[in-house]
Amino acid sequence: MIHLRNVRLRRGPEPLLEAATVSILRGEKVGLVGRNGCGKSSLLALLRGELALDGGECEVPAHLSIASVAQELPHSQRPVIEHVIDGDQGLRDCERRLQEAEQRNDGVAQAEALAQYELQGGYTARSRAAALLDGLGFDVQRIDEPIAAFSGGLRMRANLARALMCPSD
């Protein structure tokens, strides 16, 4: 459960949130709407632990996974399919542990990492990411192209696919 009590959040001299109080139960779906600059992105950054409070209390369970769509348009040479798979940070952490175990030639750590990789859905990640991209209007023949090669609208859809790839509560 997420609890905000009398939260005050500022960006510069202007208050974005003042005396905000809300409880969000596990499994509850919440939409965040408001005008530009009213603090929607800042509130999400607060919930992800990326911003500090200016006042009040914010309780977010440590194990909670929150997915959100980045507003910034990615402009990199990384393939769009990899950008989407990056949304599953647990899977990427598992891949990193596997690579480290291979570099150390640690067979036990490799076996543990491979077991975790399977549990994380690593063997199906690429096909799941491709299905998300296909469903959002991408030409599946182009999913290995750099994300920078796509229009702004398609790059925003890639951000949506990345958020959908993230296992979240």
Q: Which residue stretches match the model-derived regions?
A:
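ABC ATP-binding cassette signature C-motif
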Residues: 1-169
